[in-house]
Amino acid sequence: MFVARSIAADHKDLIHDVSYDFHGRRMATCSSDQSVKVWDKSDNGEWNCTASWKTHSGSVWRVTWAHPEFGQVLASCSFDRTAAVWEEIVGESNDKQRGLSHWIKRTTLVDSRTSVTDVKFAPKHMGLMLTTCSADGVVRIYEAPDVMNLSQWSLQHEISCKLSCSCISWNPSSSRAHSPMIAVGSDDSNTAYSGKVQIYEYVENTRKYAKVETLMTVTDPVHDIAFAPNLGRSFHVLAIATKDVRIFKLIPMRKESSSSGPTKLEVQLQAQFDGHNSQVWRVSWNITSTLLASSGDDGCVRLWKANYMDNWKCTGILRGDGSPVNGAAGQAGTPGAAGTPGGPASQNALQAVAGRKKAQLMPG
């Protein structure tokens, strides 16, 4: 059962992204009004805006939290061609704001010559690393060598993807059997260029990222991409938001002992859903990777789950105002797909409906 609650976000323009922190007790929103807002959940379940500030000189496309072991740290990216890192600090005893927290900019990353379209922190086992992608087709990976000094970031890798980039996702697996892997989606509207999703893997011998796979069947613009939590699986699961929702299974092939190159992947399409009957803008997994949420231009959030027969189907539809759509269950995905059956989502799911200035909150 999902209960929706509207939040008067008070943004002056479209909300482009909403992001929970690790514990689900804080969230951040960003907007074309060039601002980021931070929200804290009170004990009675209400969300209160505890910080709001102008972050960029253009639309802010994405905002994301670092793992809390690195402190209260946010990153944002913008049409103004920059990404920024923000840290919350608490006033010192001799400070006029003693005991009060406020957010300060630690650094601005200015390497991109075009709009920075996505920003993501790497999985925490890799250290404090930040990845950006931009409309000129370049993915950049930065590292903070000293986690106590977030004003210093060094550019570690640049990956040229040829196509304009719209979204990135790190494979969260911390297994030593899996090298660091990142998926990149493109919103290039030219369907003559097939393969709008590219997978890159870190190669230890060369100390560089190499392309291991291009998903050639994805020919339409990709708006979002999300690796599922790994949970010890030997394979990877990747969800893609394009003109529909797709779930791919990426199976690493056994390496030859003499091979020093990137891992070869066997790609299987697990499921494909056109239930939105429109462009899909966001996909998000629950923490156990048993439930996938998607939001689209139909103004609905749809929930997808694999049953005990490993077939994916729609288990719920919520309108932009949070009200359920009758007859939601039973919309199956094609083809039949392997997945991990499990209980309902154990995390909150939050979607910002495109074109709205309110965030819709749907705890479950």
Swiss-Prot record:
Residues 355-364 have a biased composition (Basic residues). One of its GO terms (biological process) is attachment of mitotic spindle microtubules to kinetochore. GO terms for cellular component: GATOR2 complex; kinetochore; lysosomal membrane; nuclear pore outer ring. Residues 326-364 are annotated as: Disordered. GO terms for molecular function: structural molecule activity. Residues 327-338 have a biased composition (Low complexity). It is found in: Chromosome, Centromere, Kinetochore; Nucleus, Nuclear pore complex; Lysosome membrane. Keywords: Cell cycle, Cell division, Centromere, Chromosome, Chromosome partition, Kinetochore, Lysosome, Membrane, Mitosis, mRNA transport, Nuclear pore complex, Nucleus, Protein transport, Repeat, Translocation, Transport, WD repeat. This is Nucleoporin SEH1. It comes from Osmerus mordax (Rainbow smelt).
